[in-house]
């Protein structure tokens, strides 16, 4: 694991990897990748932690589990690999991005440029079987990703937590709101986007807070590839 994570996350999380739940999770993943098609590719599972170091996290956008279609998931919540059509939730995120800050809708769905600026795109479950949403729920991932939220919560430097939908909002109890800033709304899914996601202005609100605390805002615009 030390080779996979950048050093800042390794220092924060190394004790987790020795715990029984993680050993069981690891064995389960070996079996799953051997016997089924599982997303994302093994080298991409920890991309959220690879692209965004512990010290550089400014914003967390919490997702549920990876996209379960071919070629979509690459270890960043809501993001898809270049060349793959953005799924409906991501299309709605782009609509809100345009309405909120006037950014053009990009010709791709990769959010890597956000991750490189300090946006931790974290799913609560990091793997999934092809075509089977939530198939790796309750297997141990939640314990690891809760610990990621916990180490950020303990950090002195404030973090913006963007929580879309009830699943993400269940994590509110882990966040000290006297120290960190929470932006919440319904999920960008087509089933709920019109119930309050559209018009919630998460991108400008996050930047407004970052500027208030003297931090660099995120450039949310996504250049075409």
Curated annotation (Swiss-Prot):
PROSITE patterns: U_DNA_GLYCOSYLASE. One of its GO terms (biological process) is base-excision repair, AP site formation via deaminated base removal. It comes from the Bacteria. One of its GO terms (molecular function) is uracil DNA N-glycosylase activity. It catalyses: Hydrolyzes single-stranded DNA or mismatched double-stranded DNA and polynucleotides, releasing free uracil. Belongs to the uracil-DNA glycosylase (UDG) superfamily. UNG family. HAMAP family: UDG. This is Uracil-DNA glycosylase.
